[in-house]
Amino acid sequence: MFNTLLVALDGGPQHDRVLDLAATMAGPRSRLHLLCVLDPEFALAAGATDADRREYPAAARQQAHAEAVLADALAELRERGVDAIAQLPCGDPGEVISAQARRLQCDLIVIGHRHLSRLQRLFEPSVGQWTIDHAPCPVLVETRDP
C-alpha cells in the first residue's frame, strides 16, 4: 500500500476507473491528493466575481466542470472511507502533476490513459507520457476502457 497518492483527474471517460484504482492502492492511513489542472488560458483569477464569469464564460465553464469533478470524487472516496483532499491548480498538466507529486513527496501517481493514436500525439502531446518521464515517483496508468 502507498501512503501519499496523487490522483490526476479530468472528468474524462476513465474517471471512475482511475478513482477506483487509486482507492484500491490506498492503505488505511493513506491520503489521496486529487488534482484537476486548469488550462491557464481559461482560468479565472482567485476571487473572480460574477461579472468575471459573465465576461469569460469559457473560463467559468472550465472552472465549474473541474470543481464538480473534484467534488464528486471527494464524495465518492469519503463514502468509501478514503482520506482525500482536492486541489485545482493552473498550468501545464504534466508539469503540474510532477511538481505537485514532488512537493507532496508522493509515493504514487495515478492517472488515466486517453488512448491517442500516433498522429493525435503529434498534435496533442500525451500528459501521461510526460508525467511518466518526469515524475519523482512511480506512475500507475489506468489503461482499461471505461
Predicted segments, located by residue:
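A short acidic, glycine-rich active-site loop
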Residues: 53-68
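Phosphate- and divalent-cation-binding pockets in alpha/beta enzyme and binding domains
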Residues: 17, 96, 118
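Small/aliphatic-rich secondary-structure junction motif
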Residues: 1-53
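Gly/Ser-rich helix-loop-strand patches that form or flank binding pockets
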Residues: 24, 99-146
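Structural beta-alpha unit
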Residues: 75-109, 146
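Conserved beta-strand positions in the Rossmann-like core of class I SAM-dependent methyltransferases
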Residues: 33, 85, 140
